[in-house]
Amino acid sequence: MINLEKILCPIDFSEYSKETLKYAVSFAMKDEATLFLLHVIDMRTFEDDLEAIRVKQIKDEITKQHKSRLLDYVTKEIRNDIKIEALVVQGIPFVEIIDISKKNKIDMIVMGSHGRTGIAHIMLGSVAEKVARKAPCPVLIVKQPGRKFAIP
């Protein structure tokens, strides 16, 4: 029997993240696992705006704001009896997810199948796909509710 002690769930604060979180919470409750919630700030989206400003100070402030937001999110969405580790890091999402999973010896990653849409998805690829290919542990990819496969 597989016993999960550490589960990682990347969060992007979307409604879809809430659905994905339900799966992660369910697994954590079943095995009394620690649930690691991770929010990755992709600073590449801010780089143009930050070039002329004090970059480190702004990055630190953004990280602090996102950590506060993640903790608020956790208290609204998760029961008190689940062990939680809330992490906010800066970097490339799939790289950070894999790095955190290795550093913390994560037993399973639970994440959504889609974050980006449209041209961003085409240009940058799927974070979930990259994580599934490179992760050191099993990855459960939760499909977005209401999405159906259609053959054109």
Task: Tell what function each PLM region has.
Residues 1-19, 80, 133-152:
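Intrinsically disordered or low-complexity boundary/linker segments at protein termini
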Residues 2, 75-109, 146-152:
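Structural beta-alpha unit
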Residues 2-52:
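Small/aliphatic-rich secondary-structure junction motif
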Residues 17, 59-67, 124, 128:
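Amphipathic, non-transmembrane alpha-helical scaffold segments
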Residues 38, 85-89, 140:
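General small-molecule cofactor/ligand-binding pocket signal
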Residues 39-68, 147-152:
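Acidic, proline/glycine-rich short linear motifs
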Residues 41, 65, 88-92, 114:
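Short beta->alpha linker loops
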Residues 100-150:
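Gly/Ser-rich helix-loop-strand patches that form or flank binding pockets
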